[in-house]
């Protein structure tokens, strides 16, 4: 039986009729909204988790921490639930109530912080990284920072799923 993670990727290409007609060439859109968590961030989150598993950065029952406005956190939570990991999301208070509600309903632990610029130590990304360091200093051995904005390996490695 397939797992929900198996349905990430393989999203259809949809021909965009009007732009194709006015340009004289075929123009297609990739329907990433058809991924299980509803966005292209499903691929990103899966790539992060597969990379972490391959490098033994996370163990069964471990914790994944990420700072996000929503879509990556939703995708990470879905994947982590399927793989048996706990998810802690640090989210700025400017994120939508809907995304906060979705994350809570999916089982993520949500920490909402004041919206701060990246240069501020209180920025949600910095807070998420510090949270990982705090958990590790308290003896948690299998906790990782997803760090979605450092995808240096994912974009040059094999795609997470066929395109």
Features from the language model and the residues they span:
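Conserved beta-strand scaffold positions in the cores of enzyme catalytic domains, especially
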Residues: 13, 27, 110-112, 143-145
């Amino acid at each position: 039986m397939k797992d929900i993670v198996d349905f990430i990727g393989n999203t259809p290409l949809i021909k965009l009729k009007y732009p194709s007609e006015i340009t004289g060439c075929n123009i297609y859109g990739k329907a990433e909204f058809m991924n299980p968590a509803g966005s292209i961030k499903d691929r990103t989150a899966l790539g992060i988790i597969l990379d972490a598993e391959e490098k033994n950065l996370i163990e069964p029952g471990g914790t994944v921490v990420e700072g996000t406005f929503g879509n990556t956190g939703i995708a990470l939570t879905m994947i982590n639930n399927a793989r048996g990991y706990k998810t802690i999301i640090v989210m700025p208070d400017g994120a939508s109530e809907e995304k906060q509600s979705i994350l809570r309903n999916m089982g993520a632990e949500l920490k909402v912080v004041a919206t701060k610029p990246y240069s501020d130590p209180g920025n949600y990304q910095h807070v998420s990284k510090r949270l990982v360091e705090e958990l590790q200093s308290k003896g948690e051995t299998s906790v990782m920072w997803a760090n979605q904005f450092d995808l240096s390996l994912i974009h040059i490695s094999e795609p997470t799923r066929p395109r």
